[in-house]
UniProtKB/Swiss-Prot annotation:
Cellular component, GO annotation: cytosol
Subcellular location: Cytoplasm
Listed HAMAP family: RimP
Protein name in the entry: Ribosome maturation factor RimP
Keyword Repressor attached: no
Gene from which this protein is expressed: rimP
The keyword Zinc-finger is assigned to this record: no
Keywords from the UniProt entry: Cytoplasm, Ribosome biogenesis
Domain of life of the organism encoding this protein: Bacteria
Organism, as annotated: Streptococcus agalactiae serotype Ia (strain ATCC 27591 / A909 / CDC SS700)
Protein's job: Required for maturation of 30S ribosomal subunits.
């Protein structure tokens, strides 16, 4: 179904996305796409509406600000105390520094990470 063309729409909102949210948006968007002239999809296509996922990347300062209070994974360009990957609760982010509460073996520790040293950041699932 859908040939080789896929139109993917990612949606998000505070509190997360439900299956009902994706179904409702699909029901609204699909008929509207059919009214566009000239048709941007002359061949059959598949419409895919979904959320960015549980482990979505945090690519901007705004995304990190919105993730305060969430469990995240951060990879660094430069290690801090010989550690390049931290996973824990993002306690704060002021635009320049991330503060993360993480487990070091059996103890909670807090680390301040300069934003410019962050290579990648994403939400993480706490197991």
């Amino acid at each position: 179904m859908g040939g080789d063309y896929v139109l993917s729409i990612l949606i998000d909102k505070p509190g997360g996305i439900t299956v009902e949210d994706t179904a409702q948006l699909t029901d609204v968007v699909s008929p509207l796409l059919d009214t566009i002239q000239p048709d941007p999809f002359p061949e059959q296509y598949m419409l895919e509406v979904s959320s960015p996922g549980l482990e979505r990347p945090l690519k901007t300062a705004e995304a990190l600000s919105n993730a305060v209070g969430s469990y995240i994974n951060v990879s660094l360009y430069k290690s801090i105390d010989k550690v390049k990957i931290f996973e824990g609760d993002l306690l704060s982010f002021d635009g320049e520094t991330l503060t993360i509460d993480y487990m070091d073996k059996t103890r909670h520790k807090t680390v301040d990470i300069p934003y410019q040293t962050v290579a990648k950041a994403r939400l993480a699932v706490k197991l």
